Amino acid sequence: MCVVLQDANILDVFVPRVRQTFDTREEAYLFYLDYAKLAGFSVSTKRTSKETRHWVCNREGFLKPGQENEEPMTNKTSMRIGCPAYVKVKEDKKRNIWYFHHVQEAHNHKLEPSPRMVRYMHSHKQREAALDDLFAIMSKSGVPTQTAMNVMSELFGGRQNWSFTEKDVHNK
């Protein structure tokens, strides 16, 4: 098993550390999501409770036994390879803060830190509500999706800066 640690180009202030504190659970999640984006992996929520959250690399785990024999709807292989990278965040009710209780940075797969690849990873595909509203208005006005994408591309500096695809817009 190869162990891949974070890219040496990531500044220490962006790397999660044990006992690192946050005012809210959402703030801790956004911090880890930003780190994942810089490092080149996608994040999934594994376990939750009132006081804790486990956020894992999306390549964590394996297919459940028997699933590999089922007829898939589309022909694609599983991305899950048992990656051990995760963070566990806990709430300290006395101090009214959230903190990283466990941090495992090592991955067992190659990371994809290039912005060109990261923007298509599920946890990083987030659009602003205003953009969704503009696409909805154009769609209701009968503007084809491709034309709407071209207009938005001109307005907002090109598709290379977006974290979504034409298919994402179509599916919204």
Q: Can you describe what each PLM-predicted range is?
A:
Residues 1-121:
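Short, conserved DNA-binding cores of transcription-related domains
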Residues 18, 138, 159:
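Short, flexible active-site loop motifs that bind/organize anionic cofactors or intermediates
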Residues 45-53, 61, 66, 145-172:
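Electropositive nucleic-acid engagement tracts
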Residues 81, 143-144:
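Short, motif-level signal for alpha-helix interfacial/capping segments enriched in acidic residues
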Residues 123-126:
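Short, cationic low-complexity segments
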Residues 128-142:
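Short, amphipathic alpha-helical "recognition" segments used to contact nucleic acids or chromatin
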